[in-house]
Amino acid sequence: MLITKRKFFSLLKFRSIIKKCFFISSFVLVGALLFSGEFYKPETHVRPDNPNIEYIGRFDFSRRGIVRFDWPGVQIKTHFSGTYCAIKLKDGYNNYNIFIDGKLHKVLRTTSDTLYTLAENLNDREHTLLITKRTEARKDLVSFRGFNLNAGDSLLPVIKEKKRKIEFIGDSFFTGLGSEGKTPDCVFNRDNENCYIAFGPVLARKLNADYSIIAISGIGVVRNDGDPNLTSKRTMPYFYERTCMNDTLKWDFQKWQPDLVVVRLGNNDYWGKPYPTLHAFQTEYIKFLKRIRKLYSKASILVLCEPVKKDQHCNYISDVVNELKTESGDKKIWFEKLNVNLDKTKDFGCQEHPNESGHKKIAAALEPIIRKAMNW
């Protein structure tokens, strides 16, 4: 096929235009990426099994390259060098406090399986990182896949402090439900729940203790809040020995032996009708406390009750502890009925649950009781 001179030069001109368009498009694209911050930057990935990561609480390490969890208040600690740190999480249901160098840096609200920036543009030096789970167990487990740092940066050894250990077992008062709510009639959601400011963690920090929280809103000993039946199938004794609430893997109790166990259960059993029978309630409560004692042979156990609507259940619980002490001779278990005067206008968040001010008052009332009993 013959090409005329005119067609030949037209083709050359067309080719030149295409090259220019491609060059301009490439330049614009690269510029856009640079200014948007999406341009590729070399990063160092740190696996979750790195020895410089400290885990506090119940975590599932059974899967390679993934650490799973869901209980409220679990903590991940590390030190890192550099200006930037991100976390790989598969999670769309939870919120986390991100502390950098001991100060609250941000609240992370997860939405999907992705890489979340925790901090950037920091001073180029060593930093401490503490992540605390604000929210209680949701629909599924969280999968932690590690950290990303700038290329050349790394995690640094964590100096593990020799702290006391406390385990808190209970309900929404330990999860911090509604603790950041503005009024008692506000509706609970994940954004106003902050386990970190609930009285258990506040108390633990006062006592220089690490803590583990096994708590579920609405949970009971024999009957959960809102159940139309006299008994519920999935109460705290059902979930207690799990590594994660939403998985059946059993927890290895030898991994973490607390000095003190604080149990606050029973309010939900008697929050609304139909009430469980006294025999069923006390029998199951004694059975559960015996399980705790078997798992933690050396720990002290504080069984706590503070009146919410009615305090009759507190008498039932006191009788449980007295019967157990008489039967077994256990001198390291005791009962406390805690009366704290909370101001209805200042000390309550959502759904008649304490806010930060209310939780601080409860922790302040408990601190001298525990210090005296534990000789702390």
Locate predicted features.
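Glycoside hydrolase catalytic-domain groove-lining segments
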Residues: 276-301
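Sec-exported extracytoplasmic/periplasmic mature domains
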Residues: 174, 208, 212, 266, ...
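Surface-exposed acidic, glycine-flexible loop patches that form ligand/cofactor-binding
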Residues: 156-159, 248-257, 290-296, 373-376
